[in-house]
A protein has these predicted regions:
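Pyridoxal 5′-phosphate
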Residues: 1-216
Length: 216
């Protein structure tokens, strides 16, 4: 989102960036303080992809709507879609973006949730596909692959517990093998674990992870 915000600034828009704390959290009070009479859009991640921080989207939406119901709220849910016990449409957001590649679906396909009553101007015009929002022939195979990935994940009712168990096991093993290991992830998300290895050169770690049994 940062690069998109920079593009908007080049077009003359003013963008306010909220500073997170050391765990990546954004305070709802900081969001309230940043709102202005001319604020048009608020955009926030659902899950930080580096630290696993889960943002209080529902509370943030409420704060924004209490200030001005006309401000649109967009949530980048790419890292949290179907990986949290969260119903995205229950967050109260106006717009939600998700991506297929995070779920094992084909690359290059995603989805945009648009709340009923919200009107958007298309960036691509032409044939009027996808309800006029994105003209051009649809990538049917990618869309079908995305839908099937969602169906399979939603049918696996133990997936969240399994992800958490795998993360807990990995952390326990890492701590036992590497006493100096430091955990920097927040623990909010069940599928993200971030650590640092003091005293180990990054290129050595990368080389080890590239060996059989490892992965990058």
């Amino acid at each position: 989102m940062l690069e998109t915000c920079k593009d908007l600034e080049q077009q003359g828009y003013e963008v306010t960036y909220l500073k997170p704390d050391k765990t990546g959290h954004i305070a709802v009070d900081d969001l309230r303080a940043a709102l202005r009479p001319d604020t048009a859009l608020v955009s926030m991640m659902l899950v930080n992809n580096e630290l696993g921080t889960v943002f209080p989207i529902a509370q943030c939406v409420q704060a924004v709507k209490d200030y001005d119901k006309g401000i649109l709220f967009h949530c980048d849910a790419v890292q949290g879609f179907l990986k949290l016990p969260t119903v995205l449409t229950g967050l109260g957001t106006d717009l939600v973006t998700v991506s297929g590649h995070k779920l094992g679906a084909p690359k290059g396909v995603g989805a945009l949730y648009v709340k009923k009553g919200v009107r958007l101007r298309p960036l691509l015009t032409g044939g009027g596909q996808e309800e006029g929002l994105r003209s051009g022939t649809e990538a049917t195979a990618q869309i079908a692959g995305f839908a099937e990935a969602c169906r399979q994940i939603m049918a696996d009712r133990t997936r969240l517990e399994r992800m958490q168990a795998i993360k807990d096991y990995a952390l326990d093993r890492l701590k036992a093998e590497i006493p100096k290991l430091e955990v920097i992830s927040t623990g909010d998300a069940p599928h993200i674990c971030a650590v640092t290895l003091p005293g180990y050169k990054s290129e050595v770690v990368v080389r080890v992870l590239g060996d059989p049994g490892g992965g990058i």
